[in-house]
Amino acid sequence: MNNVKSKEENEKEEKNKTKNIEDGISIGIYNAHSRELKNIYTQILATTFFKDSKIDIVPISKEIKEYLNILDIEYTCIDKFIPTEELMNRIKRNDINVYVTFTECSPMFPMESFEEGVPCLIGNNNDYFIGSKLREYVCVDREDDPREIRDKIKIVLENKEEVLKLYREWKNNFNNEVKKQVKEFLEG
């Protein structure tokens, strides 16, 4: 068995060490645009509780830029949807991503974020992580409450290593269950 870690694995481990929230954090908000169903305004408002935080938003609308400027929030952005590879590169630069929408039943974005080693908050409109302590960490029950989103961000960042460990455990269990079900289906 090879115990040598790649440079990428070492970088992920270093980034995932517990970070002091007071140092400012990088928060990603992606694929939300300005549609109300995507809940972008509440997610942005939740970030104002973190001094010196910076948000990365893709795509961004003129209205969202105005909102960010009114709230005096530091941000980076791209005005349009971008290729997946470029989005993945942006995702991994953050301490946490938020995807607390009102409408998603099985969004890919949270899985993509976790796969890049970055925890992602979700809304309570899906069945991700049910039966796992991970759901208690990352699922926002009241999507329209910026204080709950803020509290979840704090809790996840304070327990980032455990959250990522729980994700890996959940993923392993999920993959095993899928293999079992596919086998049962194929064997009739």
Q: What are these regions, as identified by a protein language model?
A:
Residues 119-125:
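Short hydrophobic beta-strand element within catalytic cores of glycosyltransferases
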Residues 88-94:
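Short alpha-helical donor nucleotide-sugar binding micro-motif in glycosyltransferases
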Residues 143-144, 157-188:
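A charged, aromatic-enriched C-terminal amphipathic alpha-helix characteristic of glycosyltransferases
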Residues 64-83, 88:
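Nucleotide-activated donor-binding/catalytic signature segment of Leloir-type glycosyltransferases, i.e.
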Residues 17-38, 44-49, 56:
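Conserved donor-binding/catalytic core segment of Leloir-type glycosyltransferases
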Residues 101-103:
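Aromatic "clamp/platform" in nucleotide-sugar-dependent glycosyltransferases that forms part
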Residues 88, 110-115, 129:
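Short alpha-helical segment that forms part of, or immediately flanks, the ligand-binding pocket
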